[in-house]
């Protein structure tokens, strides 16, 4: 396993100004871009043990979403901030400035929604998509959400969410750290952007409120429906890395994506943060998939 210090030495962060804010990202290598997008509440550090498997195959790019990782926080934030549309604005401008084409996406959690939507908007610029524990479309009801997480996610979407996350930091300290697989060093790196109670933690609260579930929020349901319909028919090559037992891409959601066009499927061990459990298996499958385009 790659240590935090070694990873940061081998893949130092770069920074780019986007609308007055600094976006952090990793960029190493040459060739077609291999773009890793994390979700909530992680950062590009999520990919530390997977990136080395494919570094020789292209130009590795791994951003920290706005307000997360080493990217800047937004100013004067509240419940209206860090929504999907706002993340799109910053991330997609970064992509434009990096002049991306022939992209191999590697995406997880909310990073998947951001990558899927960009693919729908820019299909001729995407060469392949690898996804795991992803938001592959609207979730019809709470019965399709993991039972162990149902009550807490409903609480996040209620008035109790501010206390649970902005004050108690539940998403990072309980959900991410909950399986006990992270070292103290790894957990400290993930915790760093959210040390200060209050608005610094806002991204990790807004994200669960954006999940398109049981018809809400309406605009996210529409976006997820749209990209799911596009991806189900698109001939863009896809690699579905199925997590066993998994967490959110299970049951009905998993059966739906198994019908997507031009797709391979492999299975690795892990729950939602599968990169922390099976990075070498993921890295091996990813390397084989990307190498097949050479």
Where are these regions (language model features)?
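Histidine-centered active-site loop/cap adjacent to the catalytic His
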Residues: 282
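Flexible "cap/lid" subdomain of the alpha/beta-hydrolase fold that forms the substrate-access gate
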Residues: 2-14, 18, 22-26, 33, ...
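The serine-hydrolase catalytic nucleophile loop
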Residues: 40-51
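Active-site machinery of serine-nucleophile hydrolases
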Residues: 55-64
């Amino acid at each position: 396993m790659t240590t935090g210090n070694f990873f940061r030495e081998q893949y130092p962060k770069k920074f780019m100004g986007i609308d007055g804010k600094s976006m952090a990202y990793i960029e190493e290598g040459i060739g077609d871009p291999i773009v890793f997008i994390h979700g909530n509440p992680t950062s590009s550090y999520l990919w530390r043990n997977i990136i080395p498997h494919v570094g020789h195959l292209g130009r590795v790019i791994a951003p920290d979403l706005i307000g997360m990782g080493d990217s800047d926080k937004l100013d004067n934030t509240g419940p209206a901030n860090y929504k999907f549309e706002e993340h799109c604005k910053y991330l997609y401008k970064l992509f434009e400035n990096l002049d991306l084409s022939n992209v191999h996406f590697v995406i997880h959690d909310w990073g998947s929604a951001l990558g899927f939507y960009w693919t729908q908007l820019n299909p001729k610029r995407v060469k392949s998509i690898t996804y795991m524990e992803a938001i592959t479309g609207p979730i019809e009801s709470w019965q399709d959400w993991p039972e162990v997480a149902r009550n807490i996610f409903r609480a996040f979407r209620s008035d109790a969410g501010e206390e649970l996350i902005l004050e108690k930091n539940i998403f990072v300290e309980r959900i991410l750290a909950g399986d006990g697989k992270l070292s103290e060093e790894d957990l400290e790196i993930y915790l760093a952007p959210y040390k200060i109670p209050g608005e610094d933690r806002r991204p990790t609260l807004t994200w669960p409120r954006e999940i398109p579930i049981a018809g809400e929020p309406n605009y996210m349901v529409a976006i997820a429906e749209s990209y799911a319909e596009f991806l189900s028919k698109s001939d863009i090559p896809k690699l579905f890395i199925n997590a066993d037992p998994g967490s959110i891409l299970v049951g009905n959601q998993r059966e739906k994506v198994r019908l997507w066009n031009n797709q391979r499927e492999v299975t690795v061990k892990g729950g939602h943060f599968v990169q922390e459990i099976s990075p070498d298996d993921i890295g091996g499958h990813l390397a084989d998939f990307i190498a097949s385009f050479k």
